[in-house]
Amino acid sequence: MASNVFDHPLQELEGEDNGVKSEKASLLETSGSVDTTPEDSGHRSSDGHRGLDHCETAPVGLYGDMLINDSEIQYSRSLTEKGSPAIHNLKLDRLSEQEKQKLIVELVRIQNDGTVEVIDNGTPVSELWEFEPTKGQSTITYEKSLTESFRSIPRLKIAILVVGTRGDVQPFLAMAKRLQEFGHRVRLATHANFRSFVRAAGVEFYPLGGDPRELAAYMARNKGLIPSGPSEISKQRKQLKAIIESLLPACIEPDLETATSFRAQAIIANPPAYGHVHVAEALGVPIHIFFTMPWTPTNEFPHPLARVPQSAAYWLSYIVVDLMVWWSIRTYINDFRKRKLNLAPIAYFSTYHGSISHLPTGYMWSPHVVPKPSDWGPLVDVVGYCFLNLGSKYQPREEFLHWIERGSPPVYIGFGSMPLDDPKQTMDIILETLKDTEQRGIVDRGWGGLGNLATEVPENVFLVEDCPHDWLFPQCSAVVHHGGAGTTATGLKAGCPTTIVPFFGDQFFWGDRIYEKGLGPAPIPIAQLSVENLSSSIRFMLQPEVKSQVMELAKVLENEDGVAAAVDAFHRHLPPELPLPESSSEKKDEDDRPDLLQWFFIQIGKKCCLPCGGV
């Protein structure tokens, strides 16, 4: 899900009516802070770098403290790793906050679809674009293959914080299941709507604030980064507060069903879980970002929420979006830091600034679809698609199976969690297109309400709901969908030529990638969907050469294991100072030892608290 749920900073700098200004000026009401003090410690760290001095881990025994029997984990170097470039500091860092705002106002134009256009001309861009090399390396570089080294990793309590739709949650659920196989205790914290989905997979669940349906509807109404009016500002404030306020409890509160105590020793999060890095700072634990869309600056393609006139400004587009997001959330984040975490407020270009560029980051797409950019260093991994195998347990209705077998492979058409302004009109376009192209079609109702027909469903159409894509797509000749990262990945793995009908955010990015690689036609924005262009797209996808191109990629994807690579990246980026369990000095003999009551502390210190941010 694209990160666009908050008010736009430029609206503070340009003309606004008094109602909007008043709404933006209001602060979150004060509420009681969550107690982050460990049970056996009544004080907080005086170290300004962290809000707490330690966190407690799960009990471990003398012989049960390692993840695998031989006490070793073998690591393999990422196939996409290309070494570490030297650090570069922007000369922008020397400017005041007011000067930065002025530059951004001159650089940015807001588009009707809510995205930002970066104007690459004049002195402002030159100032932002100028680099100043610094001495040293950005991170530890791996001179030898990681397969030559071994590490013993203690079992950890891991909190995974995910904000978004089901498509955003699904790859993290796959990762959570794999982490559990290593002996970790994993809690997946996401919206209450997905409680049964997560628990059915055998993973501990904790609810985060925010309603994914409302978030999706907000983004569909407002497209990119800009709320359309005062009422939208109020709605997204409410969502933002609910999300941020729930992050700390998700990392320290007992399980709501079993009352089993929990305190995160490591955090995995996606960028829209705003506040993640501040919770990690307060708890003194490492954090690893994973996401399904690009969020790390690169010269090879622009930020999915930005438009730029030429490649010279690609890198700059990430800085612009980053700044705008930070200016939108800074009041809430600093209130959260002071009121809940007992941390000092921060400015954007402080040690804990507003980006994820200095955090270990894993991107959940195949390097064969979007290779790792050459300017992303060893902190960043492109791990591959993280599939959750749902199709193996799916039992379709007999009626559905008979319909599939009666004719040629159908075309799938569905828009997942995306809301539709006029479901009937969209359905009319779909039906007329299938008639025009003489194709059978499977229409997924989704959250948009497709398929509510006044008449009988035509024989060439079958309506489905909650059908696993990894079972459904292999039955299809081609797929038409909104372009969510997970849906796109599943279609490609099934060997289906793809037409993307983007609504907002990274969906346009994936539509462009599909078209560039010859895996489908040019994307059709939902507002431009018509019988003519949808019919043309279906005919394009049914060409043998397009099918052949997609099948070639599908064979490659079949041999990838993005979940394993993601878990490997998480383990590899854990702090080297991570202490291992030690025997209790108070034990008198083997028989007198307390049952699994050896505790160890994770203290990552300054070396592990990498510069991090507010997104």
From Swiss-Prot:
Q: Which SUPFAM superfamilies match?
A: UDP-Glycosyltransferase/glycogen phosphorylase
The UniProt regions of compositional bias labelled Basic and acidic residues, in chain numbering, are 40-54
Expression by tissue: Expressed in developing seeds, seedlings, leaves and around the apical tip of cotyledons. In embryo, expressed in the seed coat and cotyledons.
- GO cellular component term of the entry, any: plant-type vacuole
Q: Quote the EC number.
A: 2.4.1.173
Q: Per the record, what phenotype accompanies loss of this gene's function? A: Reduced growth rates. Altered embryonic development, seed suberin accumulation, cutin formation in the seed coat and reduced seed size. Lack of flavanoid accumulation in the seed coat (transparent testa phenotype).
Q: Which domain of life is it from?
A: Eukaryota
- Does the record bear Transferase in its keywords? yes
According to the record, the residues making up region (Disordered) are 1-54
Family annotation (InterPro entries): EryCIII-like_C, Glycosyltransferase_28, GlycoTrans_28_N, UDP_glucos_trans
Query: Which Pfam family, any one, appears in the UniProt record?
Result: Glyco_transf_28
Catalytic reaction equation(s): a sterol + UDP-alpha-D-glucose = a sterol 3-beta-D-glucoside + UDP + H(+)
Keyword annotations for this protein, in alphabetical order, are: Glycosyltransferase, Lipid biosynthesis, Lipid metabolism, Steroid biosynthesis, Steroid metabolism, Sterol biosynthesis, Sterol metabolism, Transferase
Q: Which GO terms describe its biological process?
A: carbohydrate metabolic process; flavonoid biosynthetic process; lipid glycosylation; seed coat development; seed germination; sterol biosynthetic process; sterol metabolic process
The Gene Ontology terms for molecular function here are: sterol 3-beta-glucosyltransferase activity
Q: Which PANTHER family match?
A: STEROL 3-BETA-GLUCOSYLTRANSFERASE (PTHR48050), STEROL 3-BETA-GLUCOSYLTRANSFERASE UGT80B1 (PTHR48050:SF16)
Function in brief: Involved in the biosynthesis of sterol glucosides. Catalyzes the synthesis of steryl glycosides (SGs) and acyl steryl glycosides (ASGs) which are the most abundant sterol derivatives in higher plants. Can act on several sterols like sitosterol, campesterol and stigmasterol. Is required for embryonic development, seed suberin accumulation, cutin formation and flavanoid accumulation in the seed coat. Both UGT80A2 and UGT80B1 are required for the normal production of SGs and ASGs in seeds.
UniProt lists the family membership as follows:
Belongs to the glycosyltransferase 28 family.
Record protein name field: Sterol 3-beta-glucosyltransferase UGT80B1
